[in-house]
Amino acid sequence: RSDDLAISERHHGLVPSNERGRSQTHIDRMARLHRDAVELPEQRTHPASATAPPAVVSASPADHRETDRVRIAYASDSAFGFYYAGDLEALQAAAAELVPFSPLRDRDLPACDGLFLGGGFPETHMDGLEQNSSMRAAVAAFIERGGAVYAECGGLMYLADSLTWEGKTRKMAGVIPAEVVMHPKPQGRGYVRLRETAAHPWPLSGDGSEAISAHEFHYSALRQVPEGLDFAYRVERGQGLDGVHDGIVYRNLLASYAHLRDTRSHPWAKRFVDFVRRCRVA
């Protein structure tokens, strides 16, 4: 056993690499220890018998006309970093140019046609998120102008009025009229099954006939949620926002606890890019 191999943990599991800052150094250390302790030539003489599944070939961004292309800014810093690489690639294949930005450090949004606010740990960075009032205002203004925005879990939390954790409350973007409160135990964890409603801004089926498979893992829950909100999903399995609904819809924003995965049966990335294209704002 070596303490050099330990990886920090907290309420959601391992501390993600976008927060550690020295992840590559840690990986290099593990590689050296493995090289010194394991007979690699012996391993090479016994290759695994299983073969990798065939890769899914997507259209290249170069296959699209320049007029089809859109710029999607996505939150990427130590507070927000949960994205599937395959989903980002699917967005690019659908003619999206992805532009990272930091809700913690940047003062304004980059020039963009749409926003993708992914998962992360806004609760551990809520002081910095509150202090960056210019970015919170920029995100809120983009949504109010009708910009297309997709937010998952941590992104949803950032868009609420406030975030409370360990007895402290900090202001967030103030787009979703509700408070987010962290709890000691998970409020939603595992696979979810959803049905789209007529309010979904970029639906798969439009009539709710297709079940949407996704997953959730959140210690937070919404409080003081007003009546009359529109929801994109009915929850058939899982928790979502309240055990019945998920996916708050406001203007051209969809914000949910569910994490989608772009697949053949549920190609959400292209549908979102098409929606961004239809909603371009000046």
Question: Where in this protein do the model-derived segments appear?
Answer:
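Cysteine-nucleophile active-site neighborhood
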Residues: 122-201
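Hydrophobic, well-ordered secondary-structure elements that form the walls
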Residues: 115, 152, 173-176, 217, ...
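C-terminal and late-domain segments of enzyme folds
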Residues: 67-68, 80-99, 110, 182, ...
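Internal gly/pro-rich beta-alpha loop/helix module
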Residues: 1-64
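Short acidic, glycine/serine/threonine-rich loops at helix termini
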Residues: 6-13, 85-87, 127, 161-162, ...
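G-domain G4 guanine-recognition motif of GTPases
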Residues: 1-5, 76-78, 218
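Phosphate-binding active sites in nucleotide-utilizing proteins
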Residues: 68-133, 137-144
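Structural motif
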Residues: 31-34, 75-78, 257-260
